[in-house]
Amino acid sequence: ALWFTMLKKLGTMALHAGKAALGAAANTISQGTQ
């Protein structure tokens, strides 16, 4: 179904965005401790 494909795409995008946000947060924290 088309909506299922859209849902999967949205989920993948959200996952990538979450990973990027986590990476940025980890970067900021590690730089703050140095």
Swiss-Prot record:
The keyword Nucleotide-binding does not apply. Keywords: Amphibian defense peptide, Antibiotic, Antimicrobial, Fungicide, Secreted. InterPro entries: Dermaseptin_dom. It comes from the Eukaryota. Expressed by the skin glands. Transmembrane segments: none annotated. GO terms for cellular component: extracellular region. The keyword Metal-binding does not apply. GO terms for biological process: defense response to bacterium; defense response to fungus; killing of cells of another organism. It is found in: Secreted. It holds the Pfam family DD_K. Its main location: secreted. Disulfide bonds: none annotated. Potent antimicrobial peptide with activity against bacteria and protozoa. Also has activity against fungi. Probably acts by disturbing membrane functions with its amphipathic structure. Belongs to the frog skin active peptide (FSAP) family. Dermaseptin subfamily. This is Dermaseptin-S2. It comes from Phyllomedusa sauvagei.
